[in-house]
């Protein structure tokens, strides 16, 4: 690479995508700078998204577990915790993550520049520092990894003290008794679980006809039932007409004519790429209506020396995938091509209470494709480990080809689902005939474990064959 630039490459953003790219580049001997607009590294994933919401969920789920455990159910020892207490737990996790990630950059001699960056020309960025000064930095190549933020429709007053998005909800100052969540996607469903777990009344407004329609229908139905059973009110096929902030809460007027009132509103319907401040018009790059950039298989934009990874390119918008995209882009940036690529079947983890996780095809997809598949199921309530820990709600479902025994999809609903799924994923990724449901019958599992669900489900499925 040329040394006439300040850096060989500049990475914009220090979230999972930016970190993956920066670490991948510096390990290949590239002179790298990472630009971060906030005081701490980690991006939205660490500070407002994945990490804090999962820390909240964990704290709430442990409270639920304690209160539902028959050992402690004499009603005189019910655990309670305020939202503020649980947020303090999330803050401690964020601080640990930030400290650890800062160490990655320091150990690898990767320079971090703090401030807001925008393109002046195809190789120059203007950096507005926190003290108000502006400096320019140049590089031969760039990786845009600036992430996304919650979508804000113009007719919703997000300055009102009772109207929140998925970022600002982490600064909730009062103890709500009733919350409206608008948008029943992954974020909306996760927060519905958290608030209901804290005994807050929840109205979940879904603009579609079922929850998380990309999931296998049984998993979606299981979540709907679990929400219904815990007291979450789900309203499908609804859209807001007007959102009205009042002194003591929020009134939502729906297009169907209904009205709802609650202490606060969490608006969780869509996200937009953080590209509007990059002055991409100065270099001729265009985004779509959601602020996202188009890239090729090597994560190059329309300008071959500028790459983009993570939420800013859209699907799959997962922290796990963003890190891998960053590593792949780093390899392509240095070598001209990348030997690595994203796996075809990216696992999905949804941190509701209980969790949902899946990898591979759904029953609906396989039916539409006319693939002759069979189903193997294991109910958690029949597993010794689940009985011991009092986690009997849940199921593991394996979809496999009737003739070849190849595993086509795995779907799990229940506590630790996002961990359990990876056992099956490891077998699904095997080549040369290694992907077979018979592996789970022919191997020995520790006992008692949740992993044993795979043996139970495999036997259940194979017994259906004739």
UniProtKB/Swiss-Prot annotation:
It is found in: Cytoplasm. GO terms for molecular function: dihydrolipoyl dehydrogenase (NADH) activity; flavin adenine dinucleotide binding; NAD(P)+ transhydrogenase (Si-specific) activity. Binds 1 FAD per subunit. The keyword Cytoplasm applies. InterPro entries: Class-I_Pyr_Nuc-Dis_Oxidored, FAD/NAD-bd_sf, FAD/NAD-binding_dom, FAD/NAD-linked_Rdtase_dimer_sf, Pyr_nuc-diS_OxRdtase, Pyr_nucl-diS_OxRdtase_dimer, STH_gammaproteobact. Keywords: Cytoplasm, FAD, Flavoprotein, NAD, NADP, Oxidoreductase. One of its GO terms (biological process) is 2-oxoglutarate metabolic process. This is Soluble pyridine nucleotide transhydrogenase. It comes from Klebsiella pneumoniae (strain 342). The gene is sthA.
């Amino acid at each position: 690479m040329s040394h006439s630039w300040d850096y060989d490459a500049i990475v914009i953003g220090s979230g999972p995508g930016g970190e993956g790219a920066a670490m991948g580049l510096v390990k290949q001997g590239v002179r790298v700078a990472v630009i971060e607009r906030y005081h701490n590294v980690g991006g939205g994933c660490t500070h407002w998204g994945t990490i804090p919401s999962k820390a909240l969920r964990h704290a709430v789920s442990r409270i639920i577990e304690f209160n539902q455990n028959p050992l402690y159910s004499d009603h005189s020892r019910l655990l309670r915790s305020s939202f503020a207490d649980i947020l303090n737990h999330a803050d401690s996790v964020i601080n640990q993550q930030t400290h650890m990630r800062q160490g990655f950059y320091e150990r690898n001699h990767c320079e971090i520049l703090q401030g807001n960056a925008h393109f002046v020309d195809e190789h120059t960025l203007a950096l507005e520092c926190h003290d108000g000064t502006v400096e320019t930095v140049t590089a031969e190549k760039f990786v845009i990894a600036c992430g996304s933020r919650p979508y804000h429709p113009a007719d919703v007053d997000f300055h009102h003290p009772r109207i929140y998005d998925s970022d600002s909800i982490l600064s909730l100052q009062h103890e709500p008794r009733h919350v409206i969540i608008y948008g029943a996607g992954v974020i909306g469903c996760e927060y519905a679980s958290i608030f209901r777990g804290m005994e807050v009344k929840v109205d979940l407004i879904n603009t579609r006809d079922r929850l998380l329609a990309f999931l296998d229908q049984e998993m979606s139905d299981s979540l709907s039932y679990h929400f219904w059973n815990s007291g979450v009110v789900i309203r499908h096929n609804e859209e807001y007409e007007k959102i009205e902030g009042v002194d003591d809460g929020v009134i939502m007027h729906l297009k169907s004519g209904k009205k709802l009132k609650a202490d606060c509103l969490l608006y969780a319907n869509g996200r937009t790429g953080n590209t509007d401040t990059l002055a991409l018009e100065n270099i001729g790059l265009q985004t779509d209506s959601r602020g996202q950039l188009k890239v090729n298989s090597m994560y190059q934009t329309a300008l071959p020396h500028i790459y983009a990874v993570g939420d800013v390119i859209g699907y799959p918008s997962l922290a796990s995938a963003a890190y891998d995209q960053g590593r792949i882009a780093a390899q392509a940036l240095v070598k001209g091509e990348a030997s690595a690529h994203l796996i075809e079947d990216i696992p999905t983890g949804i941190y509701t209470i209980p969790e949902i996780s899946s990898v591979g095809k759904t029953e609906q997809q396989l039916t539409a494709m006319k693939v002759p598949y069979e189903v193997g199921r294991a109910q958690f309530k029949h597993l010794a480990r689940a009985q011991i820990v009092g986690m009997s709600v849940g199921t593991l479902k394996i979809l496999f080809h009737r003739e070849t025994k190849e595993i086509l999809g795995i779907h799990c609903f229940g506590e630790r689902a996002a961990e359990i799924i990876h056992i099956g994923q490891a077998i699904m990724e095997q080549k040369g005939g290694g992907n077979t449901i018979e592996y789970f019958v022919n191997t020995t599992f520790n006992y008692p474990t949740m992993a044993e669900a795979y043996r139970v489900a495999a036997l259940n499925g194979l017994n259906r064959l004739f």
